[in-house]
A protein has these predicted regions:
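RNA/tRNA-interacting regions in translation and RNA-turnover enzymes
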Residues: 1-174
Length: 174
């Protein structure tokens, strides 16, 4: 699981319409303007569904975090605490230009709504999201409990190989 800030992205007729943080679970903060500055978020999708909602995690890559902190240190300004807080704070900036300078990224992990489309498995939804241009993270489809535990251990052992911080593993039924 990418360690960042969860957001929902809504598309209407294949065009990015609105984005919000998770907030209290029912109502989040509208951060559409700042989300538009994230280059990895597609603004127009190949398939023009009437309405599509996806969920993803906005994050700051460790390399970007380190570069920004080096710049802040040279300027004598306070350093950012960690990539997760830096991403969350950047996404909540009032000025989209400031957010753009923070070079945030996103990993989309769930399809919430796809009007006019049906899917049988979670793996199918991830393949669809990737085909629509959304960045997704690697995943495995496993059927045995012992294989799942081995994969979780592998993720723990290789966590520093990812360009972003992770705060665990997610196991979903397909």
């Amino acid at each position: 699981k990418v360690d960042g800030l969860s957001v929902a992205l809504e598309y209407r007729d294949g065009v990015f319409y609105q984005g919000a943080t998770r907030g209290d679970g029912r109502k989040g903060e509208d951060v559409t303007g700042n989300l538009r500055t994230i280059r990895s978020i597609p603004m127009v999708l190949p398939e023009k569904l009437p309405r599509l909602i996806v969920r993803g995690e906005v994050y700051m890559a460790r390399s970007v975090f380190e570069e920004i902190n080096e710049e802040l240190e040279l300027e004598g300004k306070p350093l950012l605490a960690n990539p997760r807080n830096a991403a969350a704070g950047s996404l909540r900036q009032k000025d989209p230009k400031m957010c753009a300078r923070r070079r945030l990224d996103i990993a989309v992990f769930n399809l919430q709504l796809a009007e006019g489309r049906t899917f049988t498995t979670h793996a199918e939804t991830l393949a669809y999201l990737k085909a629509q241009g959304f960045p997704t993270i690697s995943h495995a489809t496993l059927s045995k409990g012992e294989d799942i535990l081995c994969e979780i251990d592998r993720l723990g052992d290789t966590r520093m190989d990812f360009p972003f911080d992770i705060d665990g593993a997610v196991v979903k039924l397909n």
